[in-house]
Amino acid sequence: MIPRTNFNFCDILYNMPKALRTVIICIIAEILNFLAADVFYHTLKIPLFFDTIFTVAVVFYCGLVPGLCVSVGYNLINSLIWVLQKGVADPFIFFYTICGILIVLSTWVVSRRKAEFKISPVVTILYLVLIALISSFCTIISSGIIDYFHYIYYDVPDMMNPIKSFTESFVNHHFSLLVSCILAQISISFADRLIATFAGYGVYRLCERFIERR
């Protein structure tokens, strides 16, 4: 245990009732998810979303229910932004909430074994890779199916252009639309899940270090 030598925001969080601390951490995570997506995708034009880094951190630090709240909240707010700001009235946008829920569930199932995570750095890495593999598989399948219906009933939003380009390439090579939508998700979704999982775990360890002083 590291002694507390000064009083700062982390000390305030530490001394709060657990429920209130969890709510504040979830709100901060929600804001940071939007900032990460805005910086990496919209500003730097990196074809990855990084909008679940802090959701993963919340799952590790606070548990399943707070993680689900952050995930569902992000997709709900994002859907409202598309409707109010961009005039996109597309019900399928909110269906990506399913992907977020699956990411939270797959992360939580493995992250419950927190004691085993710290056996050694190698074990930690293996567990994180396992989470990335499971969550990316869930994301690839669920996002691919949602994209499939997007293509049938709506024009896929511009923010999906990297994946849209891959999908059209597979279609041009005579794959079915459903298979093309799923295959197009593989490279981007796996890279996104791998980076977001490791980054989220890193944020969780920082929370332990600075809030719990462990």
Where do the model's predicted regions map?
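Hydrophobic transmembrane alpha-helices
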Residues: I2-V70, L76, L80, Q85, I103-R112, G200, ...
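Alpha-helical transmembrane segments and their immediate juxtamembrane flanks
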Residues: P3-N8, I12, A19, P91-V122, ...
